[in-house]
């Protein structure tokens, strides 16, 4: 289980941080839960969060790119379940590369909470469902908000040193 090795993360105060959540609607039972739980976690931490929905995983990067122009951070959520063709690999690679490029191009946190799983049961177990081992929507939100604070800390320290 990928939960092994997950670091303990301190509770953060995300007051004043704006975050967009971009979620696919494909595999709705999974994506709806990821979306709702990520937004609820942002609200719990004090962030200003807005949610947006796109059809599938391939539409996520372009919506994330637009959101990154307006928000401090973006959380991308979706669920790609392996089928019998190579399409799974193309979709997963495309989404991951797109999100990484956007983060580097904008210098903004883009949290990748797009599940890439072999079975629907694996997706449920990572979606924050009752009894699930993991909650990737909450984890992605936590990572995005924490990274905003860390980037601000880096800028502040560099500025104090005249860098």
UniProtKB/Swiss-Prot annotation:
Active-site residues, Swiss-Prot/TrEMBL: 87
GO CC terms of this entry: cytosol; riboflavin synthase complex
UniProt keyword annotation of Transferase present: yes
One GO term (biological process): riboflavin biosynthetic process
Pathway: Cofactor biosynthesis; riboflavin biosynthesis; riboflavin from 2-hydroxy-3-oxobutyl phosphate and 5-amino-6-(D-ribitylamino)uracil: step 1/2
Reactions accelerated catalytically: (2S)-2-hydroxy-3-oxobutyl phosphate + 5-amino-6-(D-ribitylamino)uracil = 6,7-dimethyl-8-(1-D-ribityl)lumazine + phosphate + 2 H2O + H(+)
Cysteines paired by S-S bonds: none
GO MF terms, alphabetically ordered: 6,7-dimethyl-8-ribityllumazine synthase activity
EC number: 2.5.1.78
Gene3D superfamilies attached to this UniProt entry: Lumazine/riboflavin synthase
A Pfam family matched in the record: DMRL_synthase
PANTHER family named among the record's database cross-references: 6,7-DIMETHYL-8-RIBITYLLUMAZINE SYNTHASE (PTHR21058:SF0), 6,7-DIMETHYL-8-RIBITYLLUMAZINE SYNTHASE DMRL SYNTHASE LUMAZINE SYNTHASE (PTHR21058)
Role according to the record: Catalyzes the formation of 6,7-dimethyl-8-ribityllumazine by condensation of 5-amino-6-(D-ribitylamino)uracil with 3,4-dihydroxy-2-butanone 4-phosphate. This is the penultimate step in the biosynthesis of riboflavin.
NCBIfam families linked to this entry: lumazine-synth (TIGR00114)
Name the UniProt record assigns to this protein: 6,7-dimethyl-8-ribityllumazine synthase
Classification of source organism: Bacteria, Bacillati, Actinomycetota, Actinomycetes, Mycobacteriales
């Amino acid at each position: 289980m990928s939960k092994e090795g997950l670091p303990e993360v301190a509770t953060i105060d995300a007051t004043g941080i704006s975050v967009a959540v971009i979620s696919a609607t494909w595999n709705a039972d999974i994506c709806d839960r990821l979306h709702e739980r990520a937004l609820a976690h942002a609200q719990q931490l004090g962030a200003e969060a807005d949610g947006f929905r796109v059809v599938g995983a391939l539409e996520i990067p372009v919506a994330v790119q637009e959101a990154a122009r307006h928000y401090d951070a973006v959380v991308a959520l979706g669920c790609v379940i392996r089928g019998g063709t190579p399409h799974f690999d193309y979709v997963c690679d495309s989404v991951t590369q797109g999100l990484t490029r956007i983060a580097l191009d904008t210098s903004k946190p883009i949290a990748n909470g797009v599940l890439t799983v072999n079975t629907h049961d694996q997706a449920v177990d990572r979606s924050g469902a009752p009894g699930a081992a993991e909650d990737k929507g909450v984890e992605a939100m936590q990572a995005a908000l924490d990274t905003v604070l860390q980037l601000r800390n880096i800028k502040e320290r560099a500025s104090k040193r005249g860098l």
